């Protein structure tokens, strides 16, 4: 097993997008949001990560980072897109996914915290496109991600006063 740790909070990171429109809703310039130049890792760390993934001979590659990599269909949940996570840097995430696919890198597990609840998902270019990814079989998945809840801060169910399922 190879353990790869990256910093998605301070080193090389471009400030997350945000701001409000005249109605108080989060306003995002879509062209800036989807820009191929926006980076969460910074170019040096991004290159280092890709090298680590490609050079690894381990069966399992574990990537630990601070923010959720999976895509979230936030609007369907009545939430804003989390621009402070990989959803705020979609072009860079896609570059990593393209690299995984083109190099045939298998058995990548992403471990994440920060979101104050537990999540698990297959990582794929578009988890909502059933022609390229099967939620039933996982076909089309490039990696998996496990997100842990908070230890000492309030978790999302407590913050939103939502009962678990």
Describe each region flagged by the PLM.
Residues 1-165:
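Long, structured stretches of catalytic cores involved in phosphate-ester chemistry, encompassing
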